[in-house]
């Protein structure tokens, strides 16, 4: 084959890959398309009656309190009582951060009760109380912890955030097998919020510190302005309910009649961000939504009833698992799914460790140019 023809074919193949990346499934084109959803949304439904949620066994009401500014980002991690190794891996890695880009970050683990028939239920209960006392990051509600109760778990967490952490600017809901690049996520939220808010480095001391006191440090000052609505994640489009008997994703025709068609667009439950105002809106209309056991679908349905549409973000991995790669995890990805405790800590080492410092760039110049495309190719080859 002549060299010139080979180069043309290579260039054509590269262009096709770039076009697929931009406008294929979960590409930047899809992110732009999601911006048009707001104009297609129905009028918001009127608020429904208050939600009937299970009582909190470990309420942890003061988790967002304490000295200093309120959390900029509250992270709610859905976990199971027996998943202690996953929780400890998160605490020892990205969940150990209490500040990112100068703003406070708070993490809480959401869980229910061990199954009544579980042979180790009572020891689990005792261990959870001890863990909660030692760590201060547990939020437990009185329901049987199972996949089909994820909606109860998530709503309990969002309701807690609205009541006891209402000053948090954003809430991330995620799972205990998901790696979160907290510094990059905070930077992403600052960039997206920059259209409506002003973020400044200032020398304004906290109220408890007298003017002229040199003991306080320069910190970003968040001006008090109205929060815009934000529902950000890996958006799923035109998903039809599964009718497969016995499937954990099964939705009956009574729960979602065939005449309703596909689900409205919703963000993958592996990781989505809601502004505080979006949380309030969803809680107001959630009691009018059909009681679906799939929490990410339920949140999407509730958001739509409130007139809120999800915004697609290509950096949120959804259900995709990305193999460990310093450039992808440190620069381009905000989340990655299906990481066991060992991989969780290895990923944290790749992106800088507990101090967040690094001596070399995350990516070479070529990796920077290829960007998220390279990460997707790696994930595809790995799968």
Curated annotation (Swiss-Prot):
Glycans are attached at residue 149. Belongs to the glycosyltransferase 31 family. Its EC number is 2.4.1.62. The lineage of its organism: Eukaryota, Metazoa, Chordata, Craniata, Vertebrata. Residues 1-8 are cytoplasmic. It is a single-pass type II membrane protein. The chain crosses the membrane at residues 9-29. Coiled coil: none annotated. It is found in: Golgi apparatus membrane. One of its GO terms (molecular function) is glycosyltransferase activity. The gene is B3GALT4. This is Beta-1,3-galactosyltransferase 4. Gene3D superfamilies: 3.90.550.50.
